[in-house]
Amino acid sequence: MQPVKMTGKMSFSENVNLSGDCTGDYVTCQASIEDLSIKAINSRKISVKAIVTLKLICESLQDIQMITGVDETENTDIQQLKEELEFVQLAVNQRDNFRIRENVSLPAGKPEIQEIIWDDVDVRNLNTRLADDGLKLAGDLDIFVMYIGNGETGNVQWYETTASFEGSLDISGCNADMIPYVNFQIIGKTVEERPDLDGENRDIAVEVVLDMDVKAYEERKKDVIADIYSPSYDMEIENADTQLRCLVVRNNVSSRVSGNLQLENYADLMQICNCTATVQLDDVTYKEGELVAEGVVSANVFYITSSDSQPLGSVHTIIPFAGTVKIAQISADELEYNIKPSIQQLSATI
């Protein structure tokens, strides 16, 4: 039995109630699939059900007035007590698309491609740094392709490889001394077979489009008036509380997560050909100078079986994990954190 491919798109719309009025705010939406089930209805229809989690973030910019000095006129005796404040200020807030184009070739031992029936492309080890002329990016593309081989038998073949990429985005107003905070998500990808120099379909063209959300913060210092008085006359002073951000820690932490899965109902498993995974954070708590992040790794293993009636199979597993990030002692009410979990390396063995 030869596998076939079916592709399609499902549109959806959803209204989300917000806790406050966000009119005019900068809104970002992060979507992730938590659960996906596909079942056959009949020989021509399938049922697709998914649970999509939406995370909305509303941000606004405010101008904060700080008194840095008082002009003294003649015959005035004004005493000023100044304090140096350290804070970070948003200097760059930009969204742009970054395109990655790579070509890979099948090794000599693989037959040429008749039709690609499945592909999976993921971005790993993405490194970003700010420069005076923009944002520099470098990382790896994990590419997996399953295809029907060209020949009389038309056997199922697969190929997995990693391609490195680098590039840059034009970001106005940035420099190398700023603190970058970059989020990205894949919003489009195409994987196509291409003929090589000999006219055989042995080249694979991959194009990935990343939606880049780039923010850059600038560390600032400012001398402001903490107190003021005059022995010569009474002064009415109006005070107001405000909040300023300062960077406590910016760190990359790696945690090793592993698990075993008993395949009692998958006795025909012959060889693992691909493994994919996503990370889901369930809870983040702060205690005693450290952040504790708890969540799960949702992994899917794609494998070849020895059965002629069902040559392909997959199995899903969930592996819990917990990781810690050391930070300075600070009040929990004053702490604001952003954690971006991602998969750096992934492997599955029998």
Regions found by a protein language model. Name each.
Residues 1-350:
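C-terminal beta-sandwich interaction modules and adjacent acidic
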